[in-house]
A protein has these predicted regions:
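Short, extreme N-terminal segment that most often corresponds to the first beta-strand
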Residues: 1-32
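Low-complexity intrinsically disordered segments
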Residues: 41-191
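N-terminal interaction modules that seed assembly of large macromolecular complexes
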Residues: 26-47
Length: 191
């Protein structure tokens, strides 16, 4: 089983986050998110947040609105569009998991599977990386939480003996832009 996690952006206290099925540990997905921040300005990250529309991962392609379908032609190009009609959004966007850079390469794709509640289940969500555009920080989360954190914005509800993931590190985006450090160096005690 892969190391599952969550990644995405937050603005105006609203998450646009998606599930990542494997390699979510800091040295993989974490470093990818860190590198994404290094290569993008705060304005570019705000633009991405603003253009992303969240969809339910179980929603069928045939159920998409015209607005949601707009720009997805590139995703159909490798397959017969008629064969994909009954596919769900999770399957269609599988190759976008954990890679915000793909939204740059495929600029017309503007949908993301909505996984905002996954971070609340730290038994299964092992790591999380959220670019918080309200505070201009990268927030790094860790799963397997056996104790609640009263200040956790995702609550204190227990699920199978586990609480929501907790923030283990906040790193200013300006510091990331102005430093040669890697995420591993910021998280030295967590590796």
């Amino acid at each position: 089983m892969g190391t599952r996690g969550i990644y995405g952006l937050r603005k105006n206290k609203k998450d646009k986050t998606s599930y990542n099925h494997y390699d979510s540990y800091p040295s993989c997905l974490g470093e990818q998110m860190f590198d994404y921040i290094k290569r993008h300005s705060i304005e570019e990250m705000n633009d991405l947040y603003d253009r992303l529309m969240l969809v339910d991962e179980n929603k069928k392609i045939s159920e998409l609105t015209e607005e949601e379908k707009n720009g997805l032609e590139i995703l159909f190009s490798y397959n017969d569009k008629n064969e994909l009609i009954d596919e769900d959004m999770y399957s269609l966007l599988r190759n976008f998991q954990g890679d915000l850079e793909k939204y740059d390469r495929y600029h017309t794709v503007n949908i993301m599977c909505d996984s905002k509640d996954f971070i609340k289940n730290s038994l299964f969500c092992e790591y999380g990386y959220i670019i918080n555009l309200d505070t201009n920080e990268l927030e790094v989360f860790e799963g397997f939480q056996k104790k609640p954190q009263k200040t956790n914005r995702y609550g204190c509800e227990c699920n199978r003996g586990y609480y929501p993931c907790k923030i283990i590190k906040k790193i200013k985006i300006d510091d990331i832009h102005n430093s040669d450090k890697t995420l591993e160096q910021y998280l030295e005690k967590y590796y």
